[in-house]
Amino acid sequence: MRYYLTPEPDPQSDEKIADINHLYQTAQERAERGEATLSTDEMTGVQALERKHPDLPMHPGHVLRREFEYERHGTLSFIVNFDVASGRVGQISSGSTRNEADFLAHVRATVDAGPRVVQWHFVVDNLNTHQSESLVRYVAEESDLDIDLGVKGKSGILASMQARAVFLSDPTHRIVFHYTPKHASWMNQVQIWFSILSRKLLKRGIFTSVAELKAKVLAFIAYFNRTMAKPFRWIYQGKALVA
């Protein structure tokens, strides 16, 4: 089977790939200068599932056995920062939604927790909440910019998502967003960590409530940072990927 409605490539794809590759390659060097490089994204609709019947543990000659029926106790969305230089998971936010206000609150909490950081770099995808009016206003405030931002949907920097993304990507600001090419969120290193979380915890976990789900995710993050964290070895250089 093959897809046939192939989307148009991002015209800025090569530029964005080069920018993110350079960001990853220089993350540790810039960390020594007081800059932070964070790979940030949402993990949405994480289900708190409780199995109706207990697992049968593995023993010699038998794999762990699990029944397929479960009870669903709600969902959570997580916003996670993966520190590219250290390989550690930092700021994490959770809740029932993942809207513009949630993302802004997450970025604000991240920046507030690092007052000595001289410049913040966030690698994000092209979700509309990552290019919002409130985010533009916050970055302008944090960068001490006293300028006319225009009117959302009508004029100036706030006129369109594209104009807002250009502003948010300005390397002279204290907070800089680096956008992955369209349909290339795999370039965001936090996606690798999401896979680790899914394999190590979520797929085998039993959660009787969203509170227990959150507690176990936070406990796993503490365990990961203590025993497993190290920078990912990023070798992709922008060459075409062949299936």
At which residue positions do the language-model features occur?
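C-terminal anion-handling pockets and recognition modules
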Residues: 173-179, 183-184, 191-243
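RNase H-like polynucleotidyl transferase catalytic core
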Residues: 65-70, 143-189, 206-207
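Short glycine-/polar-rich loops that comprise or flank the Walker A/P-loop
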Residues: 34-35, 118-119, 171-176
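Acidic/histidine-rich, metal-coordinating catalytic segments
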Residues: 117-130, 153-155
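Electropositive, glycine- and tryptophan-enriched low-complexity nucleic-acid-binding patches
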Residues: 58-118
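Charge-mixed, compositionally biased segments that are often intrinsically disordered regulatory tracts
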Residues: 1-72
